[in-house]
């Protein structure tokens, strides 16, 4: 047997440790070996090993009881002693374990011939109780032989044995029991049973001389890698004895297999195991096998002679025991290398085990030809038919090279498989019942193994490696068939997998050498790949068995379970891109090192839990009983779940085995059946009904529609059309068909077809299959087609499908066909028209609409003509009638539509549960540099708008008519431009979040909507195909607007003359006037002169706009200096010019200089007077630069700033001004010699003046000290002279800087708008306006602003995250900008480094992400539909997804599609959604739009608008009726029409008068207009939320934040008022969810006539008892005992208490707090109406209530409770009620309240409901949906009908319907 143990040791790399010194004998409690013999000159006395239970109080005594285990051990988390899953108690049916002396004369031990020099283990005898077995003659020898034939590299080691003689005889076995007193009792076991025992002998010459009557045992050794301390057992000795535990009686017999089940406990999911037992009554019962906290441990030492390569191959013996019971014995063995887990199995009777799993006959074995035992033996295969012959032993190195996994088998049909080799853990023995087949392996391994550092092939599939620590596994494999005696192992493991972890050890090896750690990741290559990938190139030591060894002191490679040293490299200067790559590598590394547990989301906020429970309910098919459950939790909105679908009548044709095997889940099958069932019906118009699958993203719509196609295919309808949004989804369609069991249905791409007959020869004669097309290809046309009949794709499809054919048309992702009936001012989309035309042309087709967002808004349902909601003989004749009715009634009407469609069997909408999914909105703080850049862009846009308007106003009517679309283009570009700026502000935060997620062992998905590819390509074309920097998308948008859409006319460009060629001929005075106006505010605008003059010296200031301001103003100053000194050399003054400037601009610049020379000269002279006449000597060049920069900062229109100057300083400055000008003018940093001048000398004087240590050191030191004293004296004198001057200039600079900053950040609107006028046409002379000149000036301004604008967001993100090698990009663009290793930026096609075409690059990137090769994915709209990026259980990359929404989609359908990429079925964990929103108020416009769409989506698509309230974006939803009223109030307040403002203006607005500034700003963005009289008016269509939130993007940051804050305050106030009035629309109203007692009193049923179709509507009369008696109030009071909890009294009459009565209330805190101020919230329970749904703070309560004692409240409570039974609250408090005095029943404050609910097919009687609800005044009142749950647990959802309308509604329904009757409830 020890050859197997040695093989396991070798597999773990521990075989070289097997040579040990002989242990010291001990006689105490030992087992003596009576047959010690000498084998091959090596005498060995075996050591003893004692079993004991660590839970025993006397664990080291020989009487300790050893618990036999039926299952493997599982180690504890902290590396402690492994514990068994199954303990043993009085009824477990244990066995007695004894050790017995070995007997000479037999070489058959444990069914395996002993291997000489093998590892020694104690002899164990396992004695089952209550069973007898034939005795065995232990003395009969058995001498089978074996011949080993080695072969070359990668030997496949297999052996075979023939039948061995069965021992016979009736020899009694003697066992000794050693009690606690140390005495031994001898007893004979032959009358009881023959013991089974496990015994290991030793041999060095290949002979076995020890008898064996043992059970078959399959040992297994696991290397231990955790340090543990052990003490020597008192029983450790070389002598032998026997230990028998106390006998147990009355134990049941175990039978059958172990049953595993998973249950939910308080600690989470746990796996339990049940074992079948036969009790004393003969009954078969199952008992839970409980874990025990201890294990049996054997302690001993290794005997000598345990060398490598000395093992022989054992042969099988015969099982003697006939009881048919298998037992597993597991123990911990303590060897010199720490603990080793030894597992032995006792197999059933008649089983023989051989090393290669053979049965001994006709099986091949291997013979060693030369008798060598090296690792490179040549093996050849032979076959024996009789007794195996003996051969030379095979070395361990040769044997452990087999990585396929040795199989041990037996004749009884059991296979014992040695699995887990090289899987990062150690080898395990595994048994599995087989069908009496041979277990021979005769094929070469094909997996990757490691031997002597080389990669080899090995057949064993790698086991799963634990992500947290190295692990070994017990893996059950399915029974495998055999072919010619060979076992073909199943690749798929069985269900039961028990894994345990290493007890890791850092113990040094006994050889005395350095501590080593085995690299045991052969099969998975995890260690090697990481080591090689990490650049590990050191020479590693090699073990004697050929294994690679590395020092244990080396740094651990993350996740590899091994160590590897890190290379020490010299740091090199890195570029920004290289730094980004290194940071991403570091994030990957940290992510692997830190195995963070997944955060549990069970403890959520109370409000979230409440919202989830109220909004959703777990979904199970209501009328379907077949099919397997969906792999993930699926929910349905509560309102939809209250409606039952119709009965199932359709008989499905899909084979049952596909359904039973889970190819389609039950809820998917439900949609298939209902769709096919609906397809059997016809509409009144004769068209076939369609079906709408509204399941959310990730539920599995693709597989559902694939099954619908499959079902129709089985019915003989073999042609189908599948329309989707992306050609990449064709592969998903094929996958879905394959997964649902229809792999043979072909799928063809329409865009690959020629424009000809599809069934013709040109297209391959396609007669049947699925024609896959995109919506974009559907509108394709080809005028060059041979036949006009096939010129368009839709005509091709119609011809191929057949006009009368009844096949399936799938409109997948049908939200792309929306906007068939768009809003005013837009045109229907061509896609929508094509979809409508296709349905009309094929009236018999079976149409399926499939989309998670198919009905985002009712207007987008226009193409769903097959749902029967409108049309001939429907409730709505035309779609216009339907849309007007639904939109007028709001969200409640949409909920009714969704419920009605489900009730008709037209619609199902389920979605994945949001459990485990977290949502967060994170606002990004804006930097000051970004704010400056943003405000500069705002100024440029304001000036552009002013110039657009000015030029258009000067045109006549005819010219103006050609510019109708200019403003549409302008505002569209305006929105895009600032959207790009908003996104750019979030890039840094996004990169930081991404790196943190990678470090936290997660992966990242970033959502974008646009890629900016068009801007990149446009710029690339302009630059001639070469780019050296990232393209600014924002700059391209603005530049393109001015360049392409600025209104210029030929009459304004002086006829046919070229304005640029004749630029010199323009009148100078006009330009001079413009220049004067421009120059005066350049310091405030943030631009330099309009020609783009810059200088190279200003670059040291900083980044962004500050840099531009400095450069530009430095240029102005230098130009002024040039003019004042008479230097006309413009090249020196104009060192750098803008790209848009041409030669003519230089002359214009000269004019500007001459016009402003005096002003600038005065400014410069003032600066020179302040600074003094400095030279460039004595290392002060840096001071010159500082002076120049200070000059640039102080340059402004206030050139006559008040600077206090001394007269002497003035004269000194004047005398030296000429010299200074000359030096500054001639200064060129590239022409000066700085070798002798150190600009940092004044900061490093001590370093410069330190003398070298030479012979003249002292003298030089004295000289230097003297020179230093002189310099210090001069310096102090200079400082004194300049002290006053510097103080004065600093004082002036601070004042100016303060004014500038206030103007930039919080300047008044007048100053801000004035400073934005770059193009001066303020004279009002129309002759001075030249559009081409203005256009040129605007383009030049754009170029000056461009350096500070952000680059393309997508390219910047990829670059900062390490480049394309780390980021998987799934977008629609063809190329991207990449940074090379040298830092150069270049344009590259996306598939440049890939092996796939550009069409498949997205799929390739997706696969890399799902495989974990890339952990960051960026998706755009092109990849948003259909692509699955969730943590799929089938994927390699199972990390949790962090979905960062960098750019919020503009519509809900796009948002839902993006959210659904990472939240789908079959996922390991739900994603984390992070919505990044900058603090720019205008950007909340996008959040508002998405939130509004999500709310509407939840209402219509999922029947409940609150379904999306868990998404945090709902707080930004302003686009509702409250927002619209608030906007109207805001606009009227700003222009002064609203009188007293509803809300006071923001107090923190300090820039100016708030309303006055907002008027100017809102005029600047087109929201307000000023008429001829100077009065402000509201622009047409300005009072819309989207336009308002879009336009305020164009305001400076401080202004838009203040304005949006003011707008939000108005919205909050309006909502608060509506809640106070009780008119706030909260969605679906719930009855019966709290303590209310709800009963259905009466139901009136109405059924439709035949001509009106079959429908059914019901009016329910619901009674609600909501009062709370005094006894119930006291019970509630006892549960709340805080200080503020208790009874309160209120006087509703106020001061008039004499004529009014008191009302009581019970107030108690509920633990919630307000989100705004953190105040605790309290619930209010009244005696008449119960608990109020409105929560209040104590501050609000104190205004109306005061606390009283219980006795005082009791009387008031009872009186109010009794009165509420028959009067309203008005009568009770005031003694009268105005409502009842008018003859109307008043229910306010009554204990019992009556509701009337209209349910059923409400859409069928919608016109009647509409007429009744509108009333006589035709007001558009809201439609309140109510959900009722009665005491009888009945659910009713419908419309709430007011009591005043009930009588009229009943009359109208009786007239319209064919029959009505009353159903009274008991």
Swiss-Prot record:
KO phenotype (gene knockout): RNAi-mediated knockdown results in embryonic or larval lethality. Surviving animals exhibit slow growth, gonad migration defects, vulval induction defects and reduced lin-3 expression. Larvae that develop into adults are sterile, and only few produce embryos. RNAi-mediated knockdown in males results in tail defects including underdeveloped tails, spicule defects and missing rays. RNAi-mediated knockdown in a lin-3 e1417 mutant background abolishes vulval induction.
SUPFAM superfamilies referenced in this protein's UniProt entry, alphabetically: P-loop containing nucleoside triphosphate hydrolases
Keywords, sorted A to Z: Nucleus, Transcription, Transcription regulation
Compositionally biased tracts (Basic and acidic residues): 1164-1177, 1262-1281, 1290-1304
Region (Disordered): 19-63, 132-151, 156-253, 561-581, 1112-1308
Biased composition (Acidic residues): 1142-1152, 1194-1213
UniProt biased composition (Low complexity): 19-28, 161-176, 229-239, 1112-1126
Main location: nucleus
Pfam families reported for this sequence: AAA_34 (PF13872), Helicase_C_4 (PF13871), SBNO (PF25373)
Tissue specificity of this protein: Expressed in the somatic gonad, neurons, hypodermal cells, seam cells, the excretory system, and intestinal cells (at protein level).
Function: Transcriptional activator that functions upstream of the let-60/Ras and let-23/EGFR signaling pathways to positively regulate lin-3 expression and thereby promote vulval induction. Plays a role in excretory duct development. Plays a role in male tail development.
Protein name: Protein strawberry notch homolog
Highest classification ranks of the organism: Eukaryota, Metazoa, Ecdysozoa, Nematoda, Chromadorea
């Amino acid at each position: 047997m020890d050859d197997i143990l040695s093989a396991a040791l070798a597999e773990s790399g521990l075989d070289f440790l097997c040579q040990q010194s002989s242990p010291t004998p001990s006689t105490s409690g030992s087992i003596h070996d009576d047959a010690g013999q000498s084998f091959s000159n090596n005498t060995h006395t075996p050591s003893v090993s004692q079993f004991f239970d660590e839970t025993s109080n006397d664990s080291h005594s020989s009487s300790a009881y050893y618990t036999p285990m039926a299952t493997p051990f599982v180690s504890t988390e902290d590396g402690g002693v492994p514990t068994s899953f199954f303990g043993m108690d009085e009824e477990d049916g244990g066995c007695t374990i004894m050790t017995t002396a070995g007997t000479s004369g037999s070489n058959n031990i444990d069914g395996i011939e002993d291997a000489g020099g093998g590892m020694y283990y104690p002899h164990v005898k396992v004695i089952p109780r209550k069973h007898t077995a034939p005795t065995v003659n232990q003395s009969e020898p058995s001498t089978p032989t074996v011949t080993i034939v080695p072969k070359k590299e990668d030997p496949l080691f297999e052996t075979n044995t023939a039948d061995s003689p069965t021992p016979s005889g009736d020899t009694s076995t003697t066992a000794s029991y050693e009690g606690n007193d140390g005495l031994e009792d001898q007893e004979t076991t032959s009358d009881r049973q023959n013991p089974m025992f496990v015994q290991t002998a030793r041999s060095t010459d290949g002979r076995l001389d020890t008898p064996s009557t043992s059970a078959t045992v399959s040992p297994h050794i696991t290397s231990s890698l955790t340090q543990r301390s052990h003490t020597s057992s008192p029983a450790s000795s070389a002598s032998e004895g026997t230990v028998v535990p106390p006998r147990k009686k009355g134990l049941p017999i175990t039978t059958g297999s172990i049953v595993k089940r998973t249950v939910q406990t308080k600690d989470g999911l746990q796996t339990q195991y049940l074992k079948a037992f036969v009790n004393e009554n003969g009954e078969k019962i199952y008992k839970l096998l409980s874990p025990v906290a201890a294990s049996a441990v054997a302690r001993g030492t290794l005997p000598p002679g345990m060398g490598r390569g000395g093992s022989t191959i054992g042969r099988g013996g015969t099982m003697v025991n006939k009881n048919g019971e298998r037992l597993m014995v597991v123990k911990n063995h303590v060897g010199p290398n720490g603990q080793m887990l030894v597992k032995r199995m006792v197999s059933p009777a008649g089983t023989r085990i051989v090393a290669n799993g053979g049965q001994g006959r006709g099986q091949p074995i291997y013979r060693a030809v030369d008798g060598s035992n090296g690792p490179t033996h040549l093996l050849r295969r032979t076959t024996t038919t009789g007794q195996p012959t003996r051969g030379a032993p095979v070395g361990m190195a040769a044997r452990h090279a087999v990585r396929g996994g040795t199989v041990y088998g037996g004749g009884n049909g059991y296979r014992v498989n040695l699995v887990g080799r090289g899987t990062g853990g150690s080898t395990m023995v595994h048994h599995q019942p087989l069908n009496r087949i041979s277990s021979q392996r005769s094929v070469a391994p094909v997996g990757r193994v490691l031997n002597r550092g080389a990669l080899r092939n090995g057949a064993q599939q790698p086991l799963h490696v634990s992500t947290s620590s190295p692990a070994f596994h017990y893996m059950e494999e399915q029974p495998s068939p055999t072919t010619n005696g060979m076992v073909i192992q199943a690749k798929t493991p069985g269900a039961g997998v028990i894994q345990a972890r290493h007890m890791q050890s850092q113990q040094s090896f006994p050889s005395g050498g350095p501590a080593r750690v085995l690299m045991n990741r052969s099969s998975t290559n995890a260690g090697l790949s990481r080591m090689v990938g990490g650049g590990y190139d050191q020479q590693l030591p090699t073990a004697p068995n050929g294994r690679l060894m590395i020092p244990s002191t080396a740094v651990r490679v993350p996740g590899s379970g091994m160590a590897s040293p890190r290379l020490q490299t010299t740091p090199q200067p890195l570029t920004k891109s290289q730094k980004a790559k290194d940071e991403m590598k570091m994030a990957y590394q940290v992510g692997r090192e830190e195995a963070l547990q997944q955060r549990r989301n069970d403890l959520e906020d109370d409000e979230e839990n409440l919202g989830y429970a109220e909004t959703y309910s777990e979904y199970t098919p209501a009328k379907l009983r077949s099919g397997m459950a969906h792999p993930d939790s699926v929910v349905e909105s509560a309102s939809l779940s209250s409606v039952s679908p119709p009965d199932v009548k359709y008989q499905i044709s899909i084979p049952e085995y596909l359904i039973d095997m889970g190819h389609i889940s039950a809820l998917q099958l439900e949609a298939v059946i209902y769709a096919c069932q609906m397809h059997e019906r016809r509409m009144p118009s004769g068209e076939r009904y369609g079906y709408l699958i509204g399941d959310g993203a990730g539920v599995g719509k693709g597989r559902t529609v694939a099954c619908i196609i499959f079902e129709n295919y089985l019915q003989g309808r073999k042609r189908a059309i599948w329309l989707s949004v992306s050609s990449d989804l064709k592969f998903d369609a094929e996958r879905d068909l394959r997964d649902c069991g229809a792999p043979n249905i072909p799928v063809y791409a329409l865009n690959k077809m020629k424009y000809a007959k599809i069934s013709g020869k040109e297209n391959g004669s396609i007669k049947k299959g699925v024609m896959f097309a995109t919506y974009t290809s559907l509108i394709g046309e080809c005028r060059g087609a041979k036949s006009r009949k096939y010129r368009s794709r839709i005509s091709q499809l119609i011809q191929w499908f057949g006009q009368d054919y009844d096949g399936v048309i799938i409109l997948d992702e049908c939200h792309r066909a929306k906007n068939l009936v768009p809003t005013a001012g837009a045109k229907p989309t061509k896609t929508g028209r094509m979809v409508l035309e296709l349905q009309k042309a094929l009236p018999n087709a079976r149409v399926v609409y499939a989309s998670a967002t198919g009905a985002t808004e009712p207007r987008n349902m226009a193409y769903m003509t097959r749902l029967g909601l409108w049309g001939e003989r429907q409730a709505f004749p035309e779609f216009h009638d339907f849309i007007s009715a639904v939109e007028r009634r709001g969200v409640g009407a949409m909920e009714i539509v969704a419920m009605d469609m489900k009730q008709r069997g037209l619609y199902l909408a389920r979605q994945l549960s949001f459990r485990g999914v977290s949502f967060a909105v994170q606002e990004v703080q804006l930097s000051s540099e970004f704010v400056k850049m943003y405000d500069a862009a705002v100024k440029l846009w304001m000036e552009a708008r002013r110039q657009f308007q000015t030029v258009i106003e000067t045109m006549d009517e005819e010219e103006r008519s050609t510019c109708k679309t200019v403003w549409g283009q302008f505002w569209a570009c305006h929105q895009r431009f600032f959207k790009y700026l908003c996104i750019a502000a979030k890039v840094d935060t996004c990169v930081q979040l991404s790196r943190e997620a990678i470090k936290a062992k997660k992966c990242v998905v970033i959502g974008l909507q646009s890629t900016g590819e068009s801007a990149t390509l446009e710029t690339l074309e302009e630059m001639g195909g070469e780019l050296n920097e990232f393209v600014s998308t924002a700059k391209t948008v603005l530049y393109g607007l001015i360049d392409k859409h600025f209104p210029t006319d030929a009459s304004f460009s002086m006829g046919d003359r070229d304005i640029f060629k004749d630029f010199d001929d323009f009148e100078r005075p006009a330009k001079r006037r413009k220049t004067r106006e421009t120059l005066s505010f350049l310091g405030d605008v943030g631009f330099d002169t309009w020609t783009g003059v810059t200088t190279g010296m200003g670059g040291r200031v900083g980044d962004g706009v500050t840099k531009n301001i400095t450069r530009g103003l430095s240029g102005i100053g230098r130009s002024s200096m040039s003019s004042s000194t008479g230097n006309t050399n413009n090249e020196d003054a104009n060192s750098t010019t803008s790209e848009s400037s041409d030669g003519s601009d230089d002359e214009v610049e000269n004019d500007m200089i001459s016009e402003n020379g005096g002003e600038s000269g005065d400014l410069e002279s003032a600066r020179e007077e302040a600074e003094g006449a400095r030279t460039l000597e004595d290392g002060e060049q840096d001071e010159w630069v500082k002076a120049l920069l200070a000059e640039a900062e102080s340059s402004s229109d206030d050139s006559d700033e008040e600077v206090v100057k001394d007269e002497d300083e003035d004269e000194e400055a004047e005398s030296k001004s000429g010299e200074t000008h000359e030096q500054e003018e001639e200064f060129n940093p590239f022409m000066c010699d700085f070798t002798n001048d150190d600009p940092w000398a004044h900061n490093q004087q001590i370093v410069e003046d330190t003398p070298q240590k030479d012979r003249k050191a002292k003298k030089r030191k004295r000289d230097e000290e003297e020179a230093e004293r002189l310099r210090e004296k001069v310096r102090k004198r200079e400082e004194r002279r300049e002290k006053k001057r510097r103080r004065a200039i600093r004082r002036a600079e601070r004042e100016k800087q303060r004014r500038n900053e206030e103007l930039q950040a919080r300047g008044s609107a007048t100053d801000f708008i004035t400073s934005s006028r770059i193009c001066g046409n303020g004279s009002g002379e129309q002759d001075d306006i030249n559009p081409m000149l203005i256009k040129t000036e605007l383009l030049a301004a754009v170029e000056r602003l461009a350096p500070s604008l952000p680059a393309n967001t997508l390219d910047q993100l990829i670059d900062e995250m390490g480049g394309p090698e780390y980021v998987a990009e799934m977008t629609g663009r063809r190329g991207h900008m990449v940074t090379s290793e040298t830092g150069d930026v270049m344009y590259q096609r996306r598939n440049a480094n890939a092996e796939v075409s550009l069409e498949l690059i997205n799929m390739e990137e997706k696969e890399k992400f799902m495989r974990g090769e890339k952990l960051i994915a960026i998706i755009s709209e092109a990849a948003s539909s259909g692509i699955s990026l969730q943590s799929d259980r089938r994927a390699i990359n199972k990390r949790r997804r962090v979905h960062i929404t960098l750019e919020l989609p503009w519509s809900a359908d796009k948002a839902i599609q993006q959210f659904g990429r990472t939240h789908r079925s079959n996922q390991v964990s739900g994603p984390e959604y992070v919505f990044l929103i900058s603090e720019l108020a205008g950007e909340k416009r996008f959040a508002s739009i998405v939130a509004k769409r999500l709310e509407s989506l939840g209402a219509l698509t999922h029947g409940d608008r609150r379904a999306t309230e868990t998404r945090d974006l709902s707080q930004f939803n302003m686009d509702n009726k409250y927002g619209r009223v608030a906007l109207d109030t805001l606009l009227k307040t700003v222009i002064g029409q609203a009188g007293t403002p509803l809300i006071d203006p923001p107090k923190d607005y300090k820039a100016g008068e708030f309303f006055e500034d907002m008027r100017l700003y809102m005029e600047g963005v087109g929201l307000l207009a000023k008429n001829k009289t100077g009065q402000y008016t509201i622009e047409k269509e300005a009072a819309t939320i989207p336009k308002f939130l879009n336009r305020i993007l164009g305001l400076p940051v401080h202004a838009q934040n203040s304005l949006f804050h003011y707008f939000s305050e108005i919205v909050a106030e309006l909502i608060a008022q509506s809640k106070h009035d009780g008119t706030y629309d909260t969605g679906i109203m719930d009855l019966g969810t709290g303590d209310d007692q709800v009963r259905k009193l009466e139901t009136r049923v109405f059924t439709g006539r035949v001509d009106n179709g079959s429908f059914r509507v019901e009016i329910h009369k619901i009674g609600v008892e909501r009062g709370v008696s005094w006894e119930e109030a006291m019970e509630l009071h006892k549960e709340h005992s805080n200080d503020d909890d208790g009874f309160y009294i209120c006087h509703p009459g106020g001061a008039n208490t004499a004529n009014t009565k008191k009302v009581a209330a019970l107030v108690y805190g509920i633990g919630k707090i307000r989100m705004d101020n953190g105040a605790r919230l309290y619930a209010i329970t009244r005696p008449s109406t119960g608990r109020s749904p409105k929560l209040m703070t104590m501050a609000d309560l104190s205004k109306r209530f005061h606390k009283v004692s219980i006795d005082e409240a009791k009387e008031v409570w009872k009186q109010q409770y009794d009165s509420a039974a028959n009067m309203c609250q008005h009568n009770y408090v005031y003694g009268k009620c105005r409502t009842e005095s008018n003859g109307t029943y008043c229910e306010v404050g009554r204990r019992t309240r009556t509701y009337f609910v209209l349910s059923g097919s409400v859409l069928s009687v919608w016109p009647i409901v509409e007429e009744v609800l509108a009333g006589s005044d035709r007001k558009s009142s809201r439609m309140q949906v109510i959900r009722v749950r009665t005491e009888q647990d009945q659910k009713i959802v419908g419309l709430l009908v007011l009591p005043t309308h009930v009588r009229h509604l009943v009359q109208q329904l009786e007239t319209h319907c064919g029959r009505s009757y009353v159903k009274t409830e008991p």
